[in-house]
Amino acid sequence: MRKILPLRAWLAAGLILGSPFSHAASNLVFCSEGSPAGFDPAQYTTGTDYDATSVTLFNRLVQFERGGTRAIPALAESWDIGDDGKTYTFHLRKGVKFHSTDYFKPTREFNADDVLFTFQRMLDKNHPFRKAYPTEFPYFTDMGLDKNIARVEKLDEHRVKFTLNEVDAAFIQNLAMDVASIQSAEYAGQLLEAGKPQQINQKPIGTGPFILSRYQKDAQIRFKGNKDYWKPEDVKIDNLIFSINTDAAVRAQKLKAGECQITLNPRPADLKALQEAANLKVPSQPGFNLGYIAYNVTHKPFDQLEVRQALDMAVNKQAIIDAVYQGAGQLAVNGMPPTQWSYDETIKDAPFDPAKARELLKKAGVAEGTEITLWAMPVQRPYNPNAKLMAEMIQADWAKIGIKARIVSYEWGEYIKRAHAGEHDAMLFGWTGDNGDPDNWLATLYGCDSINGNNVSKWCDAAYDKLVKAAKRVSDQDKRSELYKQAQHILKEQVPITPIAHSTVYQPMSKSVHGFKISPFSRNAFYGVANQP
């Protein structure tokens, strides 16, 4: 019988990150690209945060099947939908255990109280835990769940009822998203009593396949496999390590050297070498994503349509596709990818026309040499593998029409925080779909409810918003599509964004990794995954 070393013995044996070593089959190192802002997924909106939290440490009532967009039972074994489409009764799974750690020992199993705590904390600003630890839940509010969930009721220990104010065709898909990760009410009570509620974001307790062991910011995160997981066949790794490095070239070298077994977001320039490495495989799939420029319409001169039109048509998008994506990008036209149902193929892009752009700026009264800021992301993403280069190319394009753009960047968590606060003029942003529904694009990124969150253009159009909200209240997909197509036309006409590209997603990994599935939502899930050298 093969003996598995405990983590302490594994470390003591000198098997540390940064030096070549032979991995036991139960250990896996993931070369990650950034540190999570925290470990409470409901507070955040990025894949970096979710990789380290929701898909690793937590479960939801329903969750997406690995590698797909279908919502399947998880902490809820089944659910019933009322005839009016506004009530959902969830039948909870029995025998689910919360993590047991040196800072929390659960005395009971998962039940309805945990569901109530999770959602009431986000719904009620006067909730005792939220008052003790004030925080916002931007994704929850971006989707309008704070307004549409009328109440959450405990029917008994293993049944919970949600009542909505309006029909929401995407409700089950939304509950499968990271923001709906179930927290332990018992643990929250312990933290509240100890006067340390903020530790819910530092020392997480979930029901997920892995348990947090240690975290060193900007260096590594260590998890151990959850031996009490309710689906034990999914835990095939004893020790999961996130080795954090923001440099994609360094991550690629570490992967080739065997210092990690899987990474993400490779630079297009590194793909050929990774594909040719004898010890690696590089699966790929079309990206469910969009990289774009967002114009903050609350800042002058971006409040003028002519200015946004001018900046849009001054960008040489094809040159960016060629230089930044190097064959892995497709020209974007709309505010969501063509793989999303309801995408309107009749919409055409504005022509690249710097001369016309100059005319529009003159018409808008914008002086030659007007200065603005252009924010560039500090991280690589499939939808933007080199934001610095993209920003420099856009800067050069805008200089040709008399606009001086100063490039600004921040650490990723700060970048998102400041963007939500609206400090930018124009910024590079992007999105990978989170639930397979058009609402996740058209409402989350451009809707009025999202202007303090992921709608970083701060654009709120009443006619557009009416269409998007109406589509969410209809169950017939053809009718929803028609409404969403009308909304896409308004979005294109009003130019709160310049769509740049959709990209192919590549996921380089060792040939020893088995069972990993590329997520259409760009999540990196390691349950069901084995490393067998």
Curated annotation (Swiss-Prot):
SUPFAM superfamilies referenced in this protein's UniProt entry, alphabetically: Periplasmic binding protein-like II
Keywords of this entry: Peptide transport, Periplasm, Protein transport, Signal, Transport
MF annotations from Gene Ontology: peptide transmembrane transporter activity
Gene Ontology CC terms: ATP-binding cassette (ABC) transporter complex; outer membrane-bounded periplasmic space
Family: Belongs to the bacterial solute-binding protein 5 family.
Stored PROSITE patterns: SBP_BACTERIAL_5 (PS01040)
Purpose of the protein: Binds different dipeptides. Probably bind only L-amino acid containing dipeptides.
The protein's name: Dipeptide-binding protein
Principal localisation: periplasm
Keyword Protein transport: yes
Signal peptide feature range: 1-24
GO BP term (any one): protein transport
Matches recorded under Pfam families: SBP_bac_5 (PF00496)
Subcellular location, record wording: Periplasm
UniProt keyword Protein transport present: yes
